[in-house]
């Protein structure tokens, strides 16, 4: 599926002081049980604000996906030489309503590139990313910037070359595509 507007960027939409508070609380939440990382964020007001922006992007970009709810938001701290391989979110089941599917994904940058971390570029791709069919490489995302994209797009983070990148990610969910 080719989209005229495959993503939406909302620069510095979340204030710096709120980003700092989320980082502080997120660092306290990260737990590792040896099998998986547990780092769910449950800020109701934050999820409402993000859901509103995501729903507006859904409409304004002409995606018009039916969404019913949001899945959990996850806080992540990506450290030195860590990265995310190419992935897409619509292949995994939502943790809250596994009978639904992830429809729209988002990533909120909580700290500042070239001050708090270096590298760790966010990249989006159509289809098989190894064909280098990139949509965009976001290498200068300011603190508080939100990127919204359909969950069937591939995305990744390149390696962190210094510092720690802090983000929140999540999905709006809905019925499976017909």
Give the predicted meaning of each segment.
Residues 1-148, 152-178:
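Fe(II)/2-oxoglutarate oxygenase catalytic core
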């Amino acid at each position: 599926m080719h989209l005229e507007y495959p993503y939406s960027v909302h620069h510095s939409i979340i204030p710096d002081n709120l980003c700092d508070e989320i980082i502080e609380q997120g660092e306290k939440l990260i737990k590792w049980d040896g099998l998986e990382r547990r780092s769910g964020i449950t800020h109701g007001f934050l999820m409402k604000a993000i859901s509103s922006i995501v729903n507006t992007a859904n409409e304004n970009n002409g995606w018009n996906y039916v969404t019913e709810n949001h899945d959990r938001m996850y806080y992540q701290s990506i450290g030195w030489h860590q990265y995310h391989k190419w992935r897409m979110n619509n292949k995994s089941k939502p943790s809250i309503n596994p009978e639904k599917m992830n429809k729209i994904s988002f990533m909120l940058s909580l700290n500042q590139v070239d001050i708090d971390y270096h590298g760790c570029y966010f990249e989006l791709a159509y289809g098989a990313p190894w064909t280098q069919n990139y949509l965009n490489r976001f290498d200068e995302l300011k603190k508080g910037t939100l990127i919204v994209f359909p969950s069937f797009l591939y995305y990744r983070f390149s390696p962190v070359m210094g510092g720690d990148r802090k983000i929140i990610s999540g999905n709006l969910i809905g019925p499976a595509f017909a």
